């Protein structure tokens, strides 16, 4: 009986290990460096420590093996704390968070890089092109299915063809019909 329970628990644990895939998160500085030798679009997950939907997106979306594999293969993935204390060197300009209060357990001051990107809600995903120019911010929790649409939109540069809400709806409709 004990051996059977051990076997079942081992199977469950090993199944969870197979299902869980880690995104190779790097800094924006590292992504800019890698762009020089192997250009890829960048996806930046902008989060805060207190944000519940941010934590859910980490758990449910970014730990999804299909999403993680797609990100690792097609993008440089950057994770950035919108209220953190780290300095950011983006395109030769230094951004920091002068209002950061150490030891704060809730909300903190917004980082200047977050402000530069025009991000005011969390979670927000910002896509950058291969020249590290911001393309678009997507604010709000995204499921694996929802983020997949955006990942393909930006990987395949289809966003360049979208000029209106109708164009975007058409893209989604065409994308879903292929699935």
Residue spans of the language-model regions?
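Bacterial Sec-dependent N-terminal signal peptides
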Residues: 1-22
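A short beta-strand-turn-helix
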Residues: 24-42, 71
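Short active-site neighborhood of thiol/selenol oxidoreductases, capturing the structured segment around
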Residues: 38-52, 77
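Typically the conserved alpha-helix immediately C-terminal to a functionally engaged Cys/Sec
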Residues: 54-72
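Structural microenvironment flanking redox-active thiols in thiol-disulfide oxidoreductases
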Residues: 73-90
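Short, internal strand/loop/helix patches
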Residues: 94-117
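A short, hydrophobic beta-strand/beta-hairpin element that forms part of a small beta-sheet core
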Residues: 113, 121-137
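Thiol-/selenol-based redox modules, centered on thioredoxin-like
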Residues: 134-179
């Amino acid at each position: 009986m004990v051996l059977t329970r051990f076997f079942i628990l081992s199977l469950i644990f090993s199944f969870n290990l197979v299902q869980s895939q880690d995104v190779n998160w790097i800094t924006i500085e590292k992504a800019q460096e890698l762009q020089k030798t192997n250009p890829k679009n960048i996806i930046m997950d902008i989060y805060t420590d207190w944000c519940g939907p941010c934590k859910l997106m980490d758990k449910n979306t970014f730990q999804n093996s299909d999403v993680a594999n797609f990100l690792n293969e097609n993008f440089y993935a950057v994770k950035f704390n919108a209220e953190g204390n780290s300095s950011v060197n983006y395109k030769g300009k230094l951004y920091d968070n002068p209002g950061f209060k150490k030891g704060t357990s809730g909300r903190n001051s917004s980082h200047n890089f977050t402000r530069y990107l025009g991000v005011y809600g969390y979670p927000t995903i910002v896509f950058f092109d291969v020249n590290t120019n911001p393309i678009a911010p997507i604010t709000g929790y995204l499921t694996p299915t929802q983020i997949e649409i955006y990942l393909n939109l930006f990987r395949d540069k289809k966003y360049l063809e979208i000029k209106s809400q109708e164009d975007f709806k058409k893209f989604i409709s065409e994308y879903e019909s292929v699935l």
